[in-house]
Design a protein with these regions (language model features):
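Binding-site signature for planar aromatic cofactors or substrates
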Residues: 1-233
Length: 233
């Protein structure tokens, strides 16, 4: 398994920390390969416990039947699911150290998670119905008026289920990269955090800003997933 470049001060390997981030941001970019051409699909995935997986986790979801991803030979080798990024540009003007020596340059901060595993296809109506029930429960839970599958006419729902195919990824490895200026001084990191907080125009900028406030130059590998605020480096 060839892993992406991850500086030690940015990488997060604690499974539960990564799982919490994935649960909060379930829309994945699912990258598969047919041996010739890579394919990227946006697919909501639910992370579930699975004792049979190397990490104890699996991702479940579904794709349109018209999507060739699920057909035999369209997903050779490992599949990669990426979650995020929550991101924001970082201006060097936000660093207090700029006024001291000007040895600063722009960068980008972000929160992103990756999961690798073997993709399995489940073209079974009962299995797919179960996945839809779990996804619906996760997405609708906590809403004042949650939608439930039983609210839809049975014949309509049965017809819709014939148009999708279930997928499952047994997760072999899962890690995140939280690039939150943790290698810089506390003053520079907090300066960047405050700069991002004043703009809040990047995707996930508020959450990123919160993460930067939680980070320190000595701790990111087990950094907690933060509240709904966004920010990047």
């Amino acid at each position: 398994l060839n892993l992406p470049y991850n500086p030690p001060h940015d990488v997060v390997t604690d499974v539960e920390t990564v799982a919490a981030f994935v649960a909060k941001h379930p829309l994945a970019t699912l990258i598969t390969h047919d041996g010739v051409t890579p394919q990227a699909d946006m697919v909501p995935l639910l992370l579930v416990d699975d004792d049979g997986a190397p990490t104890g986790k699996a991702l479940i979801g579904h794709v349109a039947r018209a999507n060739p991803l699920w057909e035999n030979g369209r997903h050779e080798g490992l599949t990669l699911a990426t979650f995020g990024p929550l991101e924001h540009y970082v201006s060097p003007s936000w660093y207090p150290s700029k006024a001291e020596h000007h040895r600063v340059v722009p960068t980008w901060n972000y929160l992103v998670a990756h999961a690798w595993g073997e993709l399995e296809v489940h073209d079974d109506p009962r299995w797919v119905r179960g996945v839809i029930a779990k996804l619906t429960g996760a997405m609708e839970g906590g809403r004042d008026e949650p939608w439930r599958m039983g609210q839809a006419p049975r014949d309509y729902l049965d017809d819709m289920l014939t148009k999708i195919v279930g997928i499952r990824i047994s997760v072999q490895r899962m890690e995140a990269r939280f690039k939150v200026s943790s290698h810089r001084s506390d003053a520079d990191r907090l300066g960047a955090r405050d700069g991002i907080a004043t703009e809040l125009d990047g995707r996930g900028a508020a959450e990123l800003a919160d993460a930067m406030g939680e980070s320190s130059s000595s701790q990111t590998s087990s950094m907690p997933v933060v509240n709904d605020a966004r920010m990047t480096s």
